[in-house]
């Protein structure tokens, strides 16, 4: 790190620039969402681990998605809740870099996991006879580990580039956590290399994965329409539509934040988009999968039935 960079030992997170009453209202509301996120994704993990009927590649990837959602929420929301109670709460430089790394790592990994889930559905519906041969447990574990590794390595590259920059001027981050773009605005040097790497990452993670998902689901839709059984067609539509809802919410909010012209979205509006990306999406994901997925609802009924009989 540069000589001047050591002058900044902590940052101030400004959070939401609102009145005290509104901040207390948001604290209560966001606390409920936070609890629902942990309980909902925790329930998904519990059902998948306890019900042997859900020990399939599809739910293996879903369990990883639930882990990402829990981890992402734990990384950002407690800091946001603390800022609502105590505005302009400081965070150490090391803590800020750690939060940035984890945020990017979980976000990148979720992008890749959503692609893996769409590929799993593509193989299951378009090549059902070869499904067990293609989607072996060895393949699934390798793909999941690869998604986590790629996400972590790229996040590490971002943080290493940030550590090369001097931070000796303003130390107020106009956000509720150490989001990478907000941190870069405080650097006392040219950040063109950081911006190039961020743009390349956006192309790789926010253009490539949605394109692959759309290609997969175009084949899936064609295959579903050829299914003769009405029950089979309904089950396939139910499973795939839940995944498409999650994909649309996640990538839609991420693309608006990182790829839309910044002049159209002021900083305060960017914070609202980040709420959808890092807060509401993890809350909605278990609801979408439980309400629109018959197998998950069946597993929940069986689990509740065992509890009532015990």
Curated annotation (Swiss-Prot):
It is found in: Cell membrane. The keyword Disulfide bond applies. The chain crosses the membrane at residues 25-48, 57-78, 100-119, 139-157, 196-218, 236-258, 272-291. PROSITE patterns: G_PROTEIN_RECEP_F1_1, G_PROTEIN_RECEP_F1_2. It is a multi-pass membrane protein. Residues 49-56, 120-138, 219-235, 292-310 are cytoplasmic. Glycans are attached at residue 4. InterPro entries: GPCR_Rhodpsn (IPR000276), GPCR_Rhodpsn_7TM (IPR017452), Olfact_rcpt (IPR000725). Belongs to the G-protein coupled receptor 1 family. This is Olfactory receptor 2A1/2A42.
């Amino acid at each position: 790190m540069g000589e001047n960079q050591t002058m900044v030992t902590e940052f101030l997170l400004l959070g939401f620039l609102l009145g005290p009453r509104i901040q207390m209202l948001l604290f209560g509301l966001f606390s409920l969402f936070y609890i629902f996120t942990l309980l909902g994704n925790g329930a998904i993990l519990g059902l998948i681990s306890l019900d042997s009927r859900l020990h399939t590649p599809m739910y293996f990837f879903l369990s990883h998605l639930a882990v990402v959602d829990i981890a992402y929420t734990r990384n950002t929301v407690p800091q946001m809740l603390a800022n609502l109670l105590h505005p302009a709460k400081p965070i150490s430089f090391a803590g800020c870099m750690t939060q940035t790394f984890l945020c990017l790592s979980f976000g990148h990994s979720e992008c890749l996991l959503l692609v893996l889930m769409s590929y799993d559905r593509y193989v299951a519906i378009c090549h059902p006879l070869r499904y067990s041969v293609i989607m072996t447990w060895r393949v699934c574990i390798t793909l999941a580990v690869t998604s986590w590794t790629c996400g972590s390595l790229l996040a590490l590259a971002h943080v290493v580039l940030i550590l090369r920059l001097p931070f000796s001027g303003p130390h107020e981050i106009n956000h509720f956590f150490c989001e990478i773009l907000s941190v870069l605005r405080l650097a006392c040097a040219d950040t063109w290399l950081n911006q190039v790497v961020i743009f390349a990452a956006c192309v790789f993670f926010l253009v490539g994965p949605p394109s692959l998902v759309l290609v997969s689901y175009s084949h899936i839709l064609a295959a579903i329409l050829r299914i003769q059984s009405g029950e089979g067609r309904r089950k396939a539509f139910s499973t795939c539509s839940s995944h498409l809802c999650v994909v649309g919410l996640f990538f839609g909010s991420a693309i608006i934040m990182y790829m839309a012209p910044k002049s159209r979205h002021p900083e305060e509006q960017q914070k609202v988009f980040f709420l959808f990306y890092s807060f509401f999406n993890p809350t909605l994901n278990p609801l979408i999968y439980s309400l629109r997925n018959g197998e998950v609802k069946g597993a929940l009924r069986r689990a509740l039935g065992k509890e009532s009989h015990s």
